[in-house]
Amino acid sequence: MRKWILTRILPTPLYRPCFHLVCLVGTISLACNDMSPEQTATSVNCSSPERHTRSYDYMEGGDIRVRRLFCRTQWYLRIDKRGKVKGTQEMRNSYNIMEIMTVAVGIVAIKGVESEYYLAMNKQGELYAKKECNEDCNFKELILENHYNTSASAKWTHSGGEMFVALNQKGLPVKGKKTKKEQKTAHFLPMAIT
């Protein structure tokens, strides 16, 4: 039997990274034992889209969510039977129940369930309601880190900036030209219907 003799010692700063590298390579080779090199590369690839994107299936098209949209200004978005868009503080108001339909990836249309009107924004940034859905009814939905959503017109911009759906402190719609993504008037929390 041969006795092992340590002939060279790695400097301490290099010892740990080398040890971890050996362990990592050994683990990968064990885990990928029966895979081809191509399969191994795709399973270990850290830049694959699945690793870095969140899974929001409803943003991919065709999905319908029924929600109340609660603004950070303490108003629920409402579309009444005459097509008037404004806020209400009554949680149980039937006109504040919305269908949020995914039109394309990140693009939604918002429809009042009771009124059957679609939320729309014109070129001037004014919110209004339409019976028929068209390009004015498409909004880019963005989920913020604070768990609120913003909805910007997918068709219209003002001086290169996005125009957002927003309700002021009195529950009245704010013109899209005067809105920014950071403003709490443009932040809505989609609340599940209970």
UniProtKB/Swiss-Prot annotation:
Single Gene Ontology BP annotation: mesenchymal cell proliferation
SMART domains registered for this protein in UniProt: FGF
InterPro entries in UniProt: Fibroblast_GF_fam, IL1/FGF
Transmembrane segments: none
GO CC terms: cytoplasm; extracellular region; extracellular space; GABA-ergic synapse; Golgi apparatus; postsynapse
Residues the record marks as carrying a glycan: 45, 149
Any Pfam family hit: FGF
UniProt GO MF annotations: chemoattractant activity; growth factor activity; heparin binding; type 2 fibroblast growth factor receptor binding
Signal peptide start and end residues: 1-31
Source organism, top-level taxon: Eukaryota
Entry keyword set: Glycoprotein, Growth factor, Heparin-binding, Mitogen, Signal
UniProt keyword Transcription regulation present: no
Subunit comment: Interacts with FGFBP1. Interacts with FGFR2. Affinity between fibroblast growth factors (FGFs) and their receptors is increased by heparan sulfate glycosaminoglycans that function as coreceptors.
Matching PANTHER family: FIBROBLAST GROWTH FACTOR (PTHR11486)
Function text: Growth factor active on keratinocytes. Possible major paracrine effector of normal epithelial cell proliferation.
Family per record: Belongs to the heparin-binding growth factors family.
Name of this chain's protein: Fibroblast growth factor 7
Taxonomic source organism: Rattus norvegicus (Rat)
